[in-house]
């Protein structure tokens, strides 16, 4: 996993979780079925929109160049100091990964760092 809504209290996390609860009936952060998919789509959509705005066009090369020059962005997954560069086209790293498990009542919960097995 690279994201869970559990324990997240950023403005973006509160806004997105509220929308999921309102529009999709999600009862709580542990019931977001694909928090990773939601977070990746949210962050990438916003980064791409910023790059298109910066480029002033949807031309592929110009958007790529603009993405490589984006400044800081407060996303769901993390605060991206510089999401992409000319030599790094992956905004996340191994430090963003954690393990999670489904409970018997179908909640997706992170496994605390340093634990060798789920609680």
Language-model features, listed with the residues they occupy:
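Extracytosolic ligand-binding ectodomains
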Residues: 1-119
